Amino acid sequence: PLPPQYFLRVVSDRWLASETQLPVSFRHLILPEKNLPPTELLDLQPLPITALRNAKYETLYKFPQFNPIQTQVFNAVFNSDENVFVGAPTSSGKTTIAEFAILRLFQQNADGRCVYLVPNEALADMMFVQWHKKFSETIGLRVVKLTGETGADLKLLARGQVIVTTADKWDILSRRWKQRKNVQNVNLFIVDELHLLGGEDGPVLEVVCSRMRYISSQIEKQIRIVALSSSL
């Protein structure tokens, strides 16, 4: 059981006999709620790729059905425009879940714009090559990767529909969002590897995520945020 109260004592290290004591009562203390347990993985029948209800989209996948995690989150990601956080183990198919959100966007809005944020340049290169082949050659989406040079990146942002970038590059480009309409025109913001928020580059990642939410509130336009993370 908790004691009825603690005493907080503050003593100055500069002045003699300068101290105070404050009783802190626990009588009406409100404890924080316990962390919610992980979402239970339901025993669902695996969804076939025909659930995409689009012949072109179905050609993007070489497998007949989605895995259990993809099946469970499919409705939340592909059939709604709500913000979504998906925490799942490595190699559980989170990239395909990101693709659900991208396909949803361009099914609803052919002129939409998506930003896909990754933690490092190597992963950005890999995803750019993968999605350029997958989306550009199959369904005609313009996939670009930011370079870090502001002038070139503004041009890439203007013509790109799927923009692959790192947090630091997007931070530089989005700081002057009031003067950059193409930043305001982002409809979907996907953040991969969100568990790195507590790491060395976490502050920049936190800033750009908060900024996108702030932009959305200021221009009164929904910017959907989909966050992907390894299980913590």
Where are these regions (language model features)?
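Extracellular Ig-like/FN3 beta-sandwich strand-entry sites
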Residues: 3-5
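Short acidic/polar inter-strand loop motif in beta-rich domains
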Residues: 12-20
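Short coil/turn segments at secondary-structure boundaries
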Residues: 20-24, 128-129
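Conserved P-loop/Walker A NTP-binding site and adjacent catalytic elements of P-loop NTPases
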Residues: 67-232
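Short beta-strand edge segments in extracellular beta-sheet folds
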Residues: 23-32
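Conserved pre-motif I regulatory segment
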Residues: 38-87
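Extracellular recognition modules
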Residues: 7-11
